[in-house]
Amino acid sequence: MAQAVEEWYKQMPIITRSYLTAAVITTVGCSLDIISPYNLYLNPTLVVKQYQYWRLVTNFLYFRKMDLDFMFHMFFLARYCKLLEENSFRGKTADFLYMLLFGASVLTGIVLIGGMIPYLSASFAKIIFLSNSLTFMMVYVWSKQNPYIHMSFLGLFTFTAAYLPWVLLGFSILVGASAWVDLLGMIAGHAYYFLAEVYPRMTNRRPLKTPSFLKALFADEPVVVARPEDVRFAAAPFDEIHQD
């Protein structure tokens, strides 16, 4: 069993493995009181006035307490981050990392700006960790890039992947969780998808270009993909619970 887990971990692409590792270490460290969540959460005042810039990163690494909800989010992170990196961004590690950085920047900007809007500031002030929203962004992007894959939700009903974000959003509302986390992820995901996929087809211009320093860190690799015998190879059955 341990060997199988080790093999599964080693076979993960580098960005997925790095993010999953950092998230698990951070969350476990907080659960064991080795790390304090108060040193990790997003606080604009502390970032600007006390130069605690690490909070812009660490708030994406903490998935709250170690419970069943944490396990589900780790599953979502490992699954959809891996699917994107191995398929849509296969051989383009720098582009994938740039997508995550773009999403993190959009999410942070929304929370910071929302915190300055009357009547909305109180709601945005409660959003101090954006890890779940970034995970949801990956789910959204994957669903837009694979809209025709058939999925099943808890064996209750089937749908195509294009509706996956809405199914998860509906489930969050059904169990009484805040919809803000999912909505923010959908906004960030749609912003990326529009600028990276839709807008270039409309104007023949690409506003999102991966910076050269990221390209230098992760050079593009040539990809040779054998045609699968079953066209539904990438459509692993979806039988998951989503909670926030």
Swiss-Prot record:
It is a multi-pass membrane protein. GO terms for cellular component: endoplasmic reticulum membrane. The chain crosses the membrane at residues 22-42, 97-117, 122-142, 153-173. It is found in: Endoplasmic reticulum membrane. It comes from the Eukaryota. Signal peptide: none annotated. One of its GO terms (biological process) is response to stress. Residues 1-21, 118-121, 174-244 are cytoplasmic. Keywords: Endoplasmic reticulum, Membrane, Transmembrane, Transmembrane helix. Residues 43-96, 143-152 are lumenal. Coiled coil: none annotated. May be involved in the degradation process of specific misfolded endoplasmic reticulum (ER) luminal proteins. PANTHER family: DER1-LIKE PROTEIN, DERLIN. Belongs to the derlin family. This is Derlin-2.2. It comes from Arabidopsis thaliana (Mouse-ear cress). The lineage of its organism: Eukaryota, Viridiplantae, Streptophyta, Embryophyta, Tracheophyta. The gene is DER2.2.
